[in-house]
């Protein structure tokens, strides 16, 4: 009886061990599925259908400049420029409504007069009439671009000279800045022209990159066809 009891107990213990072992094996087979490495889904963006490229001429009587711009854009003469009254009639915008984009274009005569905001001792600003000095306007162009440095991942500037004899500087701003493309052109003696591309959306470098790359070629075309017409 004693031997029989031992055999029965051993068999019972063996059955328990087998049960737990089988349970552990089953759980271990399920663990890879439950604890497999998580892979995040790539964030996608809507596909953008870009128009076929084509250009038309902007050449208005009395304007001191001309250039070519895309046929799928609109040249708009606004009454204000960044909520400021226009200082001369030669400030215009190039709108791309399908992209929610706009190129702001401003013009000043070197040696001419412009209204400037002068900071007072109490922190307020007062309008003041000053002379357009070439060096000051170049400095202002760099300052306006560098205002984006807090959100920009990079700011690069490059000097260019076109076949039409136009010299200027182009700025490329990386990251989630409000503007990724800015430039200015001047003959250093009479004319100063500045442009900046903005989007009417929250800046996102990844989602805007395809549109920015597309519009970069249009900006290049504008610069390469640009001429002074007041000579």
Residue ranges and their predicted role:
Residues 182-188:
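A short, hydrophobic, proline-anchored segment that marks a local hinge/packing element in signaling
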Residues 194-198:
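Short hydrophobic beta-strand segments that form the core of ligand-binding sensory/regulatory domains
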Residues 3-9, 15, 32-100, 111-118, ...:
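N-terminal targeting sequences that direct proteins away from the cytosol to non-cytosolic compartments
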Residues 2-3, 24:
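Generic short N-terminal amphipathic or hydrophobic helices
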Residues 16-30:
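Bacterial N-terminal signal peptides
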Residues 166-181:
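Short, Gly/Ser/Thr-enriched beta-strand-loop segments that form substrate-interacting elements
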């Amino acid at each position: 009886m004693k031997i029989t009891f031992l055999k029965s107990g051993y068999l019972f213990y063996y059955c328990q061990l087998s049960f737990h072992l089988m349970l552990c094996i089953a759980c271990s087979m399920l663990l890879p599925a439950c604890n497999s490495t998580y892979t995040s889904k790539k964030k996608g963006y809507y596909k953008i259908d870009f128009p076929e490229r084509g250009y038309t001429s902007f050449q208005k009587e009395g304007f001191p400049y001309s250039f070519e711009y895309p046929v799928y854009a609109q040249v708009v003469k606004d009454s204000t420029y960044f909520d400021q009254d226009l200082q001369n009639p030669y400030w215009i915008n190039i709108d791309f409504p399908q992209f929610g984009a706009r190129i702001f274009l401003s013009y000043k005569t070197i040696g001419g007069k412009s209204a400037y905001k002068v900071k007072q001792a109490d922190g307020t600003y007062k309008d003041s009439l000053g002379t357009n000095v070439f060096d000051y306007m170049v400095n202002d162009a760099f300052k306006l671009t560098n205002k984006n440095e807090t959100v920009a991942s990079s700011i690069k500037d490059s000097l260019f000279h076109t076949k039409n004899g136009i010299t200027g500087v182009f700025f490329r701003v990386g990251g989630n800045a409000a503007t990724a493309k800015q430039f200015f052109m001047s003959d250093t003696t009479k004319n100063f022209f500045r442009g900046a591309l903005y989007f009417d959306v929250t800046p996102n470098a990844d989602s805007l990159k395809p549109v920015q790359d597309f519009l970069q070629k249009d900006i290049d075309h504008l610069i390469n066809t640009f001429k002074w017409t007041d000579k």
